Amino acid sequence: MIRAYPIIEDNMTAIWYHVPVCIRFISEGNIHALTGVNLILRNADGQILHESTISLSHIPPHSLKDYQLYVTSSSLCEGDDVNWHTCIPSFDIPLMERRVDNLYKYLNFFKESGFKIIPNDTVPRNTLMDLNILGLELKTGSLSKLIDPEAYRVIEFANAEASDSITIRSCPFSFTNPLLFSDFLSVGGVNLKTTKDNETLGYLSDIKYLENMAGGIVTKSDTTGSIGLVLGNLRKYNGDGDLIFILSWEIIWKLIMKRFPDLSIRPSMKSSSGVDRICSVLPVVVSENNSLFWGSCVYYNQTTLVTNNHVIKQYIDRPVLVDCKIFLTSDQTIKLTNEDVVITPYEQLDLSFIKLSFANQKRFKEIDNIAPVEYDYFYLTGELVSTIGFGLYFNNLYVEPLESTGNISAKYSLPLYKGDNATLPCIIVTSASCWNGSSGGGLFKQSSNQLVGLICSNAQVILPALGEEEDENTEKLSKTVLCIPIEVINSCYENLHTRDKSELNDRIGHTWNLIPYHNDIIVSKPKL
């Protein structure tokens, strides 16, 4: 159980501390490893009031009797020696008791949508119901008496918002080199905060998942606030991408207090500074018979949406046979009809405008938190930006986009139309992530939250040939994203309302298709 020390003290004046630990599970012919966290509640005199070592485990509790358990931490390593201490389970709490629990339904959606949940799916016959909060204690003594007090850091239990910077402290590659990886830092951002019934279930992040990272503690970078523990990796079967799921402390503490109702140690949750966000990026769902796919669109102005042509091309080609819906909320949609006009200004540009019918314009205006975008022409290479779109998966019960932060890696300018002398940006490359389904979403300048571009595609590169391989293998780069600049979008939109349509510069199409048109000139020193 959770260790409570016989000290009478007002817990409100005490402070929580934490340190990551590495946990091994060893049986005949089978090994597993997790990261965990040792939590202590310490008063002003340095006395420990409560202590608990916990992790999020994929090992079914009934199987634990077959394993020997060992724990270590970075301060228990001496020179080349890693000191492992025998430990035993002190409690286990199922993360989900019923299949109607919000957390079960949320994770099960991924299971039914072509995802594996790692490490849970690495154990044969495991189900989501096997996931649990595992408590550990040493066979003799307490872990806090072995770990260097200076190794502990203050922890506040907090919430986060999309785009917040986070750090995962974990112990990956436990069986490879625990000396090197006993307190490993991974830095990235929150892509999505998941809430249901006014409760934060957890967070998604595109930080790279590493083996044995489950149970790692996640903190808001450069703060003492922790938002939860790593539950695992949501990895799509087809290789489209993966995300880490972080279970919130709100859920973890709720389950612990339900198991141990007499405990008086539940900490208060430090709320995030997030505000209600105005939504300008919406999912587009295109369906025909039993096939369905989705993309994203931007609420461009009061009458118009903008997206990529490839997102709605099936609907454009076969409007009678194909349905195209825009999700406004989880339970409100609009369906495009022949009263909505779709215009693709140029075949060379993957850009389409949807002029909404009066009825659909009215539906948009009835939703309080949906508004047209504002845009910004002033952005520089290196500037911080965010991509917002419905990439990798679409869950109509949680109509929330993924948000990823990065920089403008490059932008290139050309005359947009034939005969023009003035140039404007015609392509932006960003390091913020996107995935299948993000197409048609927005690229936003972080400092102003204003639109600077439209997500179009990931870069796809040819991998080096190995040995005698003849097949050409390619790789999609989720952090190399091509976007249509706002200058191009606005100019094309204005051109819709002119009598004489300008002709697009051929080099625009060449640039977007990565067709080279430059001249290589080798400059050498003149002979004397």
Where are these predicted regions, by residue range?
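Catalytic histidine site
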Residues: 1-99, 232, 276-325, 457
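Short coil-to-beta-strand transition motifs
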Residues: 13-17, 30-33, 83, 180-187, ...
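Catalytic nucleophile loop of clan PA
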Residues: 26, 206-230, 298-299, 431-455, ...
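A generic structural motif
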Residues: 31-35, 47, 130-141, 203-205, ...
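Generic structural signal for buried aliphatic residues
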Residues: 32, 39, 164-167, 218, ...
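C-terminal cap/linker of serine protease catalytic domains
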Residues: 39, 56-93, 226-286, 361-363, ...
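Conserved catalytic-core segment of clan PA serine endopeptidases
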Residues: 49, 55-144, 269-276, 287-292, ...
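Flexible, gly/ser-rich surface segments that form the specificity/activation loops bordering the active-site cleft
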Residues: 95, 99-102, 108-111, 147-203, ...
